[in-house]
């Protein structure tokens, strides 16, 4: 396969525009300028690398929700100045109500894929895993950060409430998944205004999500894991035939 063929296999069309960057006291690199700016804002205010990283993550949940979310999962490998290494496991897990027979493999799927009948493991409430990101981020901040949860969520809340410019990348991801996204009325209202994918350069305001972030900032991760947000999430899953319950 030609080396340059990676462009044809990318999730969105784009042109690389890279410029050298140097720093003497710190650097923040993410997939979106606003997320990088959020991290840099923490450093400029006297925060450390963990404060910057968590602020960047929360901001990415606003500006690149297709890639990062508080209901997603991930891991952190943190090396401290003393040379010690710490791993925080925030990976998503299968809901307790699922098992080996929950999904039926598609006999016509390509070899090596995990396609199932009806795409039930890929689309809709039945495809959702128990979230780990929020707890993982808050644990990293508690153990190794210096700022409060309210501090590191402030940039994300600002962009969600005031709005931000939609990137070509977000537009193309919405375009690619428009048929699936249209199945959810609230998602369609935000990302498919008038039935069409939200356009690059347009302003997207996610005020309800800003309120969710404010609640998280006030009450911490327990508001999701067993608290009010968790109950709301579990109720939505129950009404939508999903598998996640409050026990997850």
Please provide the spans of the model-predicted regions.
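Noncatalytic scaffold domains of N-terminal-nucleophile
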Residues: 1-37, 41, 49-248
């Amino acid at each position: 396969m030609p080396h340059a063929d990676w462009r044809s296999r990318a999730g969105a069309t784009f042109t690389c525009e890279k410029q050298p960057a140097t720093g003497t006291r710190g650097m923040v690199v993410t997939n979106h300028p606003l997320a990088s700016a959020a991290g840099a804002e923490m450093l400029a205010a006297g925060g450390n690398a963990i404060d910057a990283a968590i602020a960047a993550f929360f901001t990415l949940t606003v500006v690149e929700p297709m890639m990062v979310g508080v209901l997603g999962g991930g891991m952190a490998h943190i090396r401290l100045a003393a040379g010690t290494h710490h791993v925080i496991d925030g990976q998503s897990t299968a809901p307790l109500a699922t098992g080996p027979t929950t999904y039926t493999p598609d006999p016509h799927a390509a070899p090596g894929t995990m396609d199932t009948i009806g795409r039930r493991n890929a689309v809709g409430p039945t495809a959702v895993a128990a979230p780990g990101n929020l707890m993982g981020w808050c644990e990293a901040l508690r153990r190794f950060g210096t700022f409060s949860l309210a501090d590191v969520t402030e940039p994300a809340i600002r962009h969600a409430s005031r709005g931000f410019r939609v990137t070509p990348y977000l537009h193309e991801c919405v375009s690619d998944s428009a048929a699936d996204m249209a199945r959810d009325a609230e998602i369609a209202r935000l990302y498919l205004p008038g039935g069409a994918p939200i356009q690059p350069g347009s302003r997207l305001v996610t005020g309800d999500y800003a309120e969710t972030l404010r609640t998280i900032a006030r009450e911490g991760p327990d508001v999701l894991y067993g608290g009010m947000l968790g109950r709301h999430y579990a109720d939505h899953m129950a009404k939508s035939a999903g598998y996640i319950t409050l026990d997850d």
